[in-house]
Curated annotation (Swiss-Prot):
A Pfam family matched in the record: CLP_protease
Localization annotation: Plastid, Chloroplast
Keywords linked to the UniProt accession: Chloroplast, Plastid, Transit peptide
GO cellular component: chloroplast; chloroplast envelope; chloroplast stroma; cytosol; plastid; plastid stroma
Signal peptide: none
Record protein name field: ATP-dependent Clp protease proteolytic subunit-related protein 4, chloroplastic
Targeting presequence: 1-68
Function noted in UniProt: Involved in plastid protein homeostasis.
Organism of origin: Arabidopsis thaliana (Mouse-ear cress)
Phenotype reported upon loss of the gene: Embryo lethal. Delayed embryogenesis and albino embryos, with seedling development blocked in the cotyledon stage. Under heterotrophic growth conditions, seedlings develop into small albino to virescent seedlings.
UniProt cross-references to CDD domains, sorted A to Z: S14_ClpP_2 (cd07017)
The UniProt record lists the keyword Transcription regulation: no
Domain of life assignment: Eukaryota
Length: 305
């Protein structure tokens, strides 16, 4: 009984203090059971619940209107100002006499035309994307060829090892697994493991642009740790080198001994030299032909020189 009496006394004292703190205007607001209109109802609710997530036009520091502009406030009940939200629009553009939608991003446009572009070093994320594209294009059509454009330095860049040689082997195996023929084209550099992918394309459809560069080399690896671990890694990198020599020999048509001798140091090829060596089948020029290319021929046609 004494505990209950003490609790009741404390509650009465706390209630009296709270009533003294609350302004009379707030107490009068609570005493009004009805509101004149729906707008006054919304204003009263906004005044009664001062949450940082509540929108409105009141001037309290806790109001959501202080946190963002009223035009961006989704909970703004004011009828005098228009609401503003996020709207996604597709604006057509004119092409001739027809209205068309804007083109997609370039990567999607290339993929739509069955072009897979390798424009980075061979790292796991790049390998994963290329494998997914090959498999999907096979699912889409098993007859149409897939075009692989290569501009890559392999698994290294500026002498720094970025990926594993097995990344190239994974792409190589999928190239042989999918049913559509894969036409390869070097559009810049095809160095190291990227040169292996270039020469692994369909026979007769391995090509390069006139200013591209092709290079073959043996795999690179750096080891550290215990002597036993280094020895295991050394055997593995030798196995990778042997496998790479076999694959080059298979697609180029030269003996493994000659391939291994040429790979002791990095060996660079121009497109014409790559054709003679057997890495590619042809050099792709523009429509005007190799004998009619450049500024000089254009000036001659214009009778300026």
């Amino acid at each position: 009984m004494e505990v209950a009496a003490a609790t009741a006394t404390s509650f009465t004292t706390l209630r009296a203090r709270t009533s003294a703190i609350i302004p009379s205007s707030t107490r009068n607001l609570r005493s009004k059971p009805r509101f004149s209109s729906s707008s006054s109802l919304r204003a009263s609710l906004s005044n009664g619940f001062l949450s940082p997530y509540t929108g409105g036009s009141i001037s309290s520091d806790l109001c959501g209107a202080k946190l963002r502009a009223e035009s961006l406030n989704p909970l703004n009940f004011s009828s005098s100002k228009p609401k503003r939200g996020v709207v996604t629009m597709v604006i057509p553009f004119s092409k001739g006499s027809a209205h068309e939608q804007p083109p997609p991003d370039l990567a999607s446009y290339l993929f739509k035309n069955r072009i897979v572009y390798l424009g980075m070093s061979l790292v796991p994320s790049v390998t994963e994307l290329i494998l997914a594209e090959f498999l999907y294009l096979q699912y889409e059509d098993e007859e149409k060829p897939i075009y692989l454009y290569i501009n890559s330095t392999g698994t290294t860049k500026n002498g720094e090892k970025l990926g594993y040689d097995t990344e190239a082997f994974a792409i190589y195996d999928v190239m042989g697994y999918v049913k559509p023929p894969i036409f390869t084209l070097c559009v810049g550099n095809a160095w190291g493991e990227a040169a292996l992918l270039l020469t692994a394309g369909a026979k007769g459809n391995r090509s390069a642009l006139p200013s591209s560069t092709i290079m073959i080399k043996q795999p690179i690896a750096r080891f550290q740790g215990q002597a036993t671990d280094v020895e295991i890694a050394r055997k593995e990198i030798k196995h990778i080198k042997t496998e790479m020599v076999k694959l080059y020999s298979k697609h180029i048509g030269k003996s493994p001994e000659q391939i291994e001798a040429d790979m002791k140091r990095p060996k660079y090829f121009s497109p014409t030299e790559a054709v003679e060596y057997g890495i590619i089948d042809k050099v792709v020029y523009n429509e005007r032909g190799s004998q009619d290319r450049g500024v000089v021929s254009d000036l001659k046609k214009a009778q300026l020189i």
